[in-house]
Amino acid sequence: MDYGKTLNLPETEFPMRAGLPQREPEFLKFWQENDIYNKKHELHEGHPKFVLHDGPPYANGKIHMGHALNKILKDIIMKYKYAQGFDTPYVPGWDTHGMPIEHACIKEMGLNRNELDVLTLRGKCHDFALKWIDIQRDDFKRLGVLGDWDHPYVTLHHDFEAEQIRVFGTMANKGYIYKGKKTVYWCPHCETALAEAEIEYGEQKTPTIFVKMPLVKDNGMTPETAKGKKAYMVIWTTTPWTMPANVAVALNPNLEYAWVECEGEVLFLAKDLLETVGQKCHKDLSNILGTTMGKDMEFAECVHPFPEYNNRRSLVVMADYVTLEAGTGCVHTAPGHGDVDFETGLKYKLPILCPVDAQGKLTAEAGERFQGMFVFDANIPVLKYLAELNCLLGKENIKHQYAHCWRCKNPIIFRATSQWFASVDGFRDDALKAIANDVQWIPAWGEQRIHNMVSERHDWCISRQRVWGVPIPVFYCEHCGEHLINEETIESVAQWFEKEGSDAWWAHTAEELLPAGTVCPKCGHNHFRKESDIMDVWFDSGSTHMAVAAKRPELGWPVSMYLEGSDQHRGWFQSSLLTSVAVTGKAPYKSVLTHGYVVDGEGRKMSKSVGNVIVPQDIIKQYGADIVRLWTASSDYKADIRISPKIIKQLSEVYRKIRNTIRYILGNTNDFNYETDAVPFNEMLELDQWALMHLQLLKKEVTAAYESYDFHVLYHAIHNFCTVEMSSFYLDIIKDRLYAYKADSKERRSAQTAMHEILMDLVVMLSPVLSFTMEEVWQFMKKPANAPQSVQMLPWPAVKEEYINEELETKWDNFIEIRSEITKVLELARRDKKIGHSLDAKVELHAEGEALAILQSVEKDLATLLIVSQAVVVEGAAAGAEATGREDLKVTVQAAEGHKCERCWIYSDEVGNDPEHPTLCPRCAAAIK
């Protein structure tokens, strides 16, 4: 007789090989065809809401690993919150205006932007953005992200643009919007102003110069020994091209400055920097004639070294930002080309010179010598001219971090221009209060970071000199130049945009856009022109909380969470906070979670030139999206997140182990009906009770990790549970019970009850992470008739506190530790060919003290627990026994006694007792009758 056929072997059609790249699209189709997203919403309608407001990615390219990480983190949270009973509407969005799209379309059309019809270019940009939205949407859906993909919010939609106009109008009516001349970040390549959030820093080699500024008014501070000699203040600058705009020299009032004789001249600079400057300029600056405090030189005067400027004076001013960290302690000041310079210029009523045009070329104001030169190309000519004039003390090249445009990657400049601003000072205090009192920051350091940024930031430059965006809704009187913006004009423009979108601004005249009968409040005339600038795209995305969350009925304001990369403290988190506080006085979000950047396996930034770029599409093609999701959950996103082929391969192995654990349980519960076959907990075998107790402990740990958004903690907890506690211990031990006991025996049903509960809870706990695989498992599981259609609809499993027993936990934890020592000795015996399988062994356990007590507590089941044929506990030590890692335990391994049962392979003296089955042990003989 073939006794193998009488065993209760696992049966399941759940595939061993995942085949995720091929199988996952089937589940995407299942979710879509069965409208799972909307069915989930209907099931939880009326429940408390958890609204995670999607930060809009930019619609201009394939998604990268950072996008994948971000969207999957959001999806994990939303799926968990749904299981916890929340209504979790998720509306994805896209950012669609701005320079990159405009640049791409101009390049595609092969024309100069000034040659293009505005509406033609805008139409091209519109189509470009929609094309990339479709591509990105498919990529995001392929990651398993569930959301309202058919009704996303898009910043170019008419209703969105209209609400953005209303947000701007509310801020303007509160007095928070103004036009003024200020130094702003300016990209000569893009020919537009930039916001602070649009700046990134990269290393750049720059010529720095030490310039002698002739001193013509010394406040009577020149030492007697210096009189009769030419005196110069020595300034230092890293931007020689800004010398034509110099109008002042800034000193620190509390620093000590020295008058130094050098080559027949007198130089004035910070005393503590004499040695450093002397070395850099190859000059002997040791002959100090006297010293003066900085404050005593206020309102002294130098003369600009360029003679064509007709002895233009440079005022000596005081500034606390002057330090001894670099330079000379005398700071070149050009208010038209620096933010702190500009503030100093206002304080001292200095002229704001900015002899640079929109393309970054020096104008006639800089002088005929430099006119038409690109700013950075002028550095060397300025340096040479100063040398000709005997005003160059020294020069050096330095490498330093310099600001670049994050769109075109070119270096930017500071340029004083007339721009529209949001007056952050008007609501800064309210914003800081909201940061401290209204928002949970995750990680906690995010609070201090954004607090510092908001407290130190300048007013927000919100105008851009482009056409692909939402226009600044301001009109100018053709007669007197007065600008016009009020509630009526804003509402009129908003209504036009609701009908036609922001194209209406260029398609209609000012008179058509304005309410009938509008006249200038200053002069009474009725002819107007429209503002030509558009809004900063950060104003677009910064308005989403009002234009989307506050408007869509399924959402709500303020939202529960914003979740983006840590760079958004100066980007979207901040722009949203500023518009929200300005309009409502409150933060738009209750919590903000930030993650780091994705880097390669060595912690380096991904770069095509380095060749270390990994894209999600390639991982999905080879391994499947669930591996990308597992990578996301396994990473501590608070720091930078590493990825490499090796890391992905390791995660695929972890996935395989988890899948195999689940497949084993599916196969061994195939003939089990929980409703009719389940064994009550108090009647279960103690080992099964232990397994369910550990399941409760796992649920506690996993729930806490989900609640604190520490997904890497739950990843490690579940991985350890599946591979160590289940596969290596519990499931290994109960295999004999599952296979060899009678199919409907209490012993077997007890184990199946435990496995069923473990599987049910594991599926729910893993479904936010391994969404595709858990959906697949759910379709294979035996379920009651009223079970939800999708795993995504299952409620979160409650912790059964009554299963938790500290005494039981201690007992089994102690045994597991001892078992590992015994298993090591068995492995040695197998290696030495004393035994083959562990069932070929009989073990004698020579124990004392604690080890003896632990072993005696499970003595009747000891052979089963050790997966050997016989186990004997002997009190006391024994000569020749194998030592273990414990002093109170030694082990002897010998061949098992008796004969091997043909069915269960356990050796026993009782094999053959049943004459009908002479090769079976009594248990197996009874099991097949």
Where are these regions (language model features)?
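Catalytic adenosine-cofactor/nucleotide-binding cores of aminoacyl-tRNA synthetases and other
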Residues: H404-C408, Y597-E602, M606-M684, K783-A787, ...
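Conserved phosphate-binding loops in nucleotide/dinucleotide-binding enzymes
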Residues: N112, G202, T333-G336, F376, ...
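NTP-handling and nucleic-acid-processing catalytic cores
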Residues: Q22-L28, L146, H158-Q359, A431-S463, ...
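Acidic, turn-prone loop/beta-hairpin segments
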Residues: D95, V184, P188, L194-G202, ...
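Short cysteine-rich clusters marking metal-coordination/redox-active sites
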Residues: C187, C405, C477, C520-C523, ...
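Alpha-helical recognition segments enriched in aromatics with Gly/Pro capping
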Residues: K217, E308, Y348-G360, R466-W468, ...
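N-terminal, positively charged nucleic-acid-binding surface of large information/translation enzymes
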Residues: M1-G264, A334-A366, C391-A431, M453-V454, ...
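Core structural elements
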Residues: F140, E163, R407, W460, ...
